[in-house]
Design a protein with these regions (language model features):
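Hydrophobic scaffolds flanking metal-cofactor catalytic centers in soluble metalloenzymes
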Residues: 1-186
Length: 186
């Protein structure tokens, strides 16, 4: 990992921690889970017994990790496609910064629509919040249909950019054990 690129890009982004890319982070073992619990983070159980750290991460402060030196192994080793492309010189830092800004803008649009509906627990990953809002009983009025269509379109725009620029494919595939999209609780 190139420290100057991570300082430049990752600290402006945070999408891998805020529930936009992933529903949760799979931990490596009980020791890692206990260490995070001692730091005050809630760890959920999973089939492997290692534990899951739900997203959005409670340690995220703005766009930065509040436990950076002690973050889980999965977080230490993950590099999004955009960071990899910047490291290879396939995309300039300026272009990468613009993609991050565009992703944040699209995500904020989804959050604004959810807020207008009064829907979605902010402690849930973005896609789950949308699914809850869309599954809610808002009736069959013209206004409800308009809101649903707007939310679906906004979330589709987010997912398209995320898969293309951050998870490494124009198609929705499993790019991480807990990736948003086809792999996330659908």
């Amino acid at each position: 990992m190139n420290p100057s690129l991570t300082d430049t890009l990752c600290t402006r982004c945070g999408l891998c921690c805020d529930g936009s890319l992933f529903a949760d982070v799979e931990l490596v073992g009980q020791a890692e889970a206990r260490r995070l619990e001692i730091m005050g983070l809630e760890v959920d159980d999973n089939e492997s017994g290692a534990g899951l750290l739900s997203q959005p991460c409670a340690a995220l402060q703005g766009r930065r990790c509040g436990i950076y030196a002690h973050r889980p192994k999965c977080c230490r080793t993950f590099e999004c496609q955009l960071l990899q492309d910047a490291q290879l010189g396939a995309v300039t830092v300026e272009a990468a910064t613009e993609l991050i800004a565009e992703a944040l803008k699209r995500i904020q649009r989804v959050r604004d629509l959810l807020a207008q509906w009064g829907a979605g627990d902010v402690r849930l990953p973005l896609k789950e919040r949308c699914a809850e809002a869309l599954a809610g009983d808002g009736g069959d009025t013209r206004e409800t249909k308009r809101k649903r269509a707007a939310l679906k379109a906004a979330m589709s725009a987010v997912e398209s950019l995320i898969w293309r620029s951050f998870l490494g494919s124009g198609e929705q595939k499993v790019a991480h054990p807990r990736a948003v999209g086809a792999a996330q609780r659908e």
